[in-house]
């Protein structure tokens, strides 16, 4: 992912006392690179191609699973539970972004949301727990997690792969799905 591409610049700029440089660096290297590139590839290219060739359901499911597995590279070590949580979380987040692209008829709103997510969470501004996106959490604002349960902490990927996050992705996806259905009912 774009995270590996940007690891060196971020490790240089994300130092205590250099908040604004860190924020700007995170925005450009992590946010834009990963957010826009992942949305372009997964929602803009793979999803659209599969939607035309395989139908809507497979076009949602297959890229979502690919998106999840791509993020395995972010984890230094993992066991079966870490992997299961990451695949569930990554797939759920990918489906959420896909529904957002379908609802808006564009990848740009999803790319903006993905960019902000990456900038704030992965870019070192805000983090929950000891691990963020498979890396040690060195964020400026850290909310500690007192639990050692991987179901809550997301294991070796971080809180983004925990059950609360997965429930959140699914809830947002269902909400977007309701809006899509309402629009279809108005048109149909």
Please give the residue ranges for each predicted region.
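Membrane-interface helix/loop boundary segments of multi-pass membrane proteins
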Residues: 37-62, 73-79, 99-109
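Alpha-helical transmembrane segments and their immediate interhelical/interface regions
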Residues: 17-24, 63-101
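Short, small-residue-biased leader/transition segments that mark boundaries at the very start
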Residues: 1-8
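Helix-boundary and loop/linker segments of multi-pass membrane transporters
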Residues: 13-22, 52-54, 154-155
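Membrane-interface capping segments at transmembrane-helix boundaries
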Residues: 176-188
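Functionally important transmembrane alpha-helices
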Residues: 81-151
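Hydrophobic alpha-helical transmembrane segments
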Residues: 22-35, 148-171
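Residue-level signature of the transmembrane alpha-helical core
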Residues: 27-32, 36, 61-68, 83, ...
């Amino acid at each position: 992912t774009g995270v590996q591409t940007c690891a060196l610049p971020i490790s240089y700029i994300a130092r205590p006392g250099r908040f604004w440089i860190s924020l700007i660096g995170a925005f450009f290297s992590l946010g834009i690179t990963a957010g826009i590139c992942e949305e372009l590839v997964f929602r803009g290219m793979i999803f659209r191609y599969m939607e035309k060739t395989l139908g809507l359901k497979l076009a949602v499911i297959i890229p979502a699973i690919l998106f999840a597995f791509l993020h395995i590279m972010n984890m230094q070590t993992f066991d079966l539970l870490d992997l299961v949580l990451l695949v569930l979380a990554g797939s759920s987040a990918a489906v959420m972004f896909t529904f957002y692209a379908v609802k808006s008829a564009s990848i740009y709103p999803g790319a903006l949301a993905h960019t902000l997510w990456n900038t704030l969470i992965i870019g070192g501004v805000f983090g929950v727990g000891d691990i963020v996106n498979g890396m040690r959490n060195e964020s400026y604002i850290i909310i500690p997690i007192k639990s050692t349960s991987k179901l809550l902490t997301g294991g070796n990927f971080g809180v983004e792969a925990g059950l609360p996050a997965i429930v959140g992705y699914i809830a947002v996806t269902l909400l977007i799905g309701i809006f899509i259905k309402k629009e279809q009912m108005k048109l149909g």
